[in-house]
Swiss-Prot record:
InterPro entries registered for this protein in UniProt: BRF2-like_C, Cyclin-like_sf, TFIIB, Znf_TFIIB
UniProt name for this protein: Transcription factor IIIB 50 kDa subunit
Residues recorded as bearing Cysteine sulfenic acid (-SOH) in the entry: C363
Oligomeric and partner information: Component of TFIIIB complexes. The TFIIIB complex has two activities, alpha and beta. The TFIIIB-alpha activity complex is composed of TBP, BDP1, and a complex containing both BRF2 and at least four stably associated proteins; this complex inhibits the transcription by pol III via its phosphorylation by CK2; YY1 facilitates the TFIIIB-alpha complex formation. Interacts with TBP; this interaction promotes recruitment of BRF2 to TATA box-containing promoters.
First and last residues of each zinc finger (TFIIB-type): 2-36
GO cellular component: nucleus; transcription factor TFIIIB complex; transcription preinitiation complex
Region feature Required for interaction with TBP and formation of a ternary complex with DNA and TBP, mapped onto this chain: 367-421
Length: 421
């Protein structure tokens, strides 16, 4: 057979293919010499008798790893090494990426979503192992848009059916506060702005817990709340030197980015602290404002559980309390004037005690303004004819029914038509 070479022993050209198990062999039919066996060769002259074997036939793989998947796997491994994650994290993130890349919704997605897929798999792995890592950190490393990243993250969790716990706020506070450059003196940080790390972290945790108890954290990004709490904790430890420092300058000194909603979270925290300060007798005479209340944050946090209960009332229990108050009004009418007078000794005449504020999320206390659609213009003038089927809705008494029947009979008689049976 031409084109297959000759037998090296007898020189015959009668070479045939013989399958030995799953291995193809080229055998001389005259002398039985095995010319080629498998894909391994020992000399350069043997290469002329070999044929090219495809990757899928030699390894049993039906599909090759695409270039985009190879780039994604490299990106996953690079992220894990940059973040200094344990090797087990890297293996889990790679496995999640390979599973997600096989999904039809991901393979046909646009390039922007595929680029953030590696970061989503790393974030899922860290969340499952309670490793403090935020979405913003991954987006900064990948130069990715936060909205695209969050949408892809939720899609991957849903498609893969993963159980991802929520981020531990305490661990996030410790990790985030450790990145502040305020714990050692430097040319960019004056000595009066340097603070002890443990004191600042302890007070920041208390302020974040207070924000969590008063609905300032629910449904929001945690970093703006933590930034505002860290700023207040830093100011309250040495208020005489730091009250003049603004939030923007504080973030610049600490070498951290200022989140956009941090100013709003700061004002909400100060409003909560003012409400709590109104419940302390020695602070009521000082007429505190949002700037001077920072000096007394230590006292407020020391009694925060009692002050929160006194300063706020639960919105869900408000209706129950109102019903009990209405029921007690009838019983209280028999009380004498002495009891009524004793309850209002400290209040001026004609004034009622102020009720505590509602303990509700800010989105319910100040709902966003929505455009109300204009009511449809009614073209009804009142002169329209009423059909016989609709007029029955306007009849109320039997007398009206009889009068209507008489009027209808008279109308038919006037028109010369016989009455219906």
């Amino acid at each position: 057979m031409p084109g297959r070479g000759r037998c090296p022993d007898c020189g015959s050209a009668e070479l045939v293919e013989d399958s030995h198990y799953s291995q193809n062999q080229l055998v001389c039919s005259d002398c039985g010499c095995v010319v080629t066996e498998g894909v391994l060769t020992t000399t350069f002259s043997d290469e002329g008798n070999l044929r090219e074997v495809t990757y899928s036939r030699s390894t049993g793989e039906n599909e090759q790893v695409s270039r985009s998947q190879q780039r994604g796997l490299r990106r996953v491994r690079d992220l894990c090494r940059v973040l200094q994650l344990p090797p087990t994290f890297e293996d889990t993130a790679v496995a999640y990426y390979q599973q997600a890349h096989q999904l039809a919704g991901i393979r046909t997605a646009r390039l922007q979503k595929k680029e953030v897929l590696a970061g989503c798999c790393v974030l899922i792995t860290c969340r499952q192992r309670n490793w403090p890592l935020t979405m913003g950190t991954i987006c900064t490393l990948l130069y990715a848009d936060l909205d695209v990243f969050s949408g892809t993250y939720m899609q991957i969790v849903k498609l893969l059916g993963l159980d991802v716990p929520s981020l531990c706020l305490v661990d996030l506070v410790k990790t985030y506060c450790s990145s502040f450059k305020l714990f050692e003196a430097s040319p960019s940080v004056p000595a009066k702005y340097v603070e002890d790390k443990e004191k600042m972290l302890s007070r920041t945790l208390q302020l974040v817990e207070l924000a969590d108890e008063t609905w300032l954290v629910t449904g929001r990004h945690p970093l703006p709340v933590i930034t505002a709490a860290t700023f207040l904790a830093w100011q309250s430890l040495r208020p005489s030197d730091r009250l003049t420092c603004s939030l923007a300058r504080f973030c610049k000194l600490a070498n951290v980015d200022l989140p956009y909603p941090a100013s709003s979270r700061l004002q909400e925290l100060l409003a909560v602290l003012l409400r709590m300060a109104e419940q302390l007798a020695w602070l009521q005479v000082l007429k505190l404002d949002k700037r001077s209340v920072v000096k007394h944050i230590g006292d407020l946090l020391q009694h925060r559980h009692m002050l929160v209960r006194k300063a706020f009332r639960d919105g869900t229990a408000e209706m129950d309390a109102g019903e009990k108050e209405l029921q007690g009004q009838g019983q209280g009418q028999g009380l004498g004037d002495e009891d009524v007078g004793s309850s209002s000794l400290e209040l001026p005449a004609g004034k009622r005690p102020s009720s505590p504020a509602l303990l509700l999320p800010p989105c319910m206390l100040k709902p966003p303004k929505r455009v109300c659609p204009a009511p449809p213009v009614s073209m009804v003038t009142g002169d329209e004819d009423i059909s016989d089927s609709e007029i029955e809705q306007y009849l109320r008494t039997p007398q009206e029914v009889r009068d209507f029947q008489k009027a209808q009979a008279a109308r038919q008689a006037a028109q010369g038509t016989p009455n219906p049976p």
